[in-house]
């Protein structure tokens, strides 16, 4: 147990018996009242966001974690089968552990899996940016080049991304896995 004042963003704590990741933590001292820490946390089992006020003197249980590199192999129902890059052991990772970024998991991608001290999976971290191929989009016309609008495009992972008008089928684009937004076209 350590004081909440020694915890920082990204730490994983045990809150009400379940693992939570600290998304943001702000110290507040309102007027002549007692100081507190306003925490926004994400429940790593359910994926729900939780807000909580910790008193400045409160202690929390920080979970000791281990991070390992794994490579995505294939999908088995709602699970993702990953292989340890060092030992070649395979594990099944539930979709909820990856969260909304699961729509950008593609063959061969290397991810970081966060394990707790009891070897259970707390979360999966994808690279911040991934390069995907556009498999389907409406064809570009001369009028499209003059405007700065966007159009929907289907990428190789099966998800839809909003892209600029000049992107064509077969283009490779870089996408932010946190937001799902188009970043840039990749020239190869």
Curated annotation (Swiss-Prot):
GO terms for biological process: peptide biosynthetic process. Keywords: Cytoplasm, Elongation factor, Protein biosynthesis. GO terms for molecular function: translation elongation factor activity. Pfam families: EFP, EFP_N, Elong-fact-P_C. Belongs to the elongation factor P family. NCBIfam families: efp (TIGR00038), PRK00529.1 (NF001810). This is Elongation factor P. It comes from Pelodictyon phaeoclathratiforme (strain DSM 5477 / BU-1). The gene is efp.
């Amino acid at each position: 147990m350590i004081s909440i004042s020694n915890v920082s963003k990204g730490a994983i704590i045990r809150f009400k018996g379940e693992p939570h990741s600290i998304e943001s933590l702000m110290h507040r001292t309102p007027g002549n009242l007692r100081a507190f820490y306003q925490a926004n946390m994400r429940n790593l089992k359910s994926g729900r966001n939780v807000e909580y006020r910790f008193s400045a003197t409160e202690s929390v249980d920080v979970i000791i974690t281990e991070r390992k590199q794994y490579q995505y192999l294939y999908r088995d129902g709602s699970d993702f089968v990953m292989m340890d890059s060092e030992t070649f052991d395979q594990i099944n990772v539930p979709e909820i552990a990856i969260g909304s970024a699961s729509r950008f998991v593609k063959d061969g991608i290397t991810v970081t899996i966060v394990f707790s001290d009891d070897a259970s999976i707390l979360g999966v971290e994808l690279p911040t940016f991934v390069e995907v191929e556009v498999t389907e989009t409406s064809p570009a016309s001369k009028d499209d080049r003059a405007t700065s609008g966007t159009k929907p495009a289907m990428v190789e992972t099966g998800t839809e991304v909003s892209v600029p008008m000049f992107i064509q089928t077969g283009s490779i684009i870089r996408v932010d896995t946190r937001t799902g937004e188009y970043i840039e076209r990749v020239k190869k």
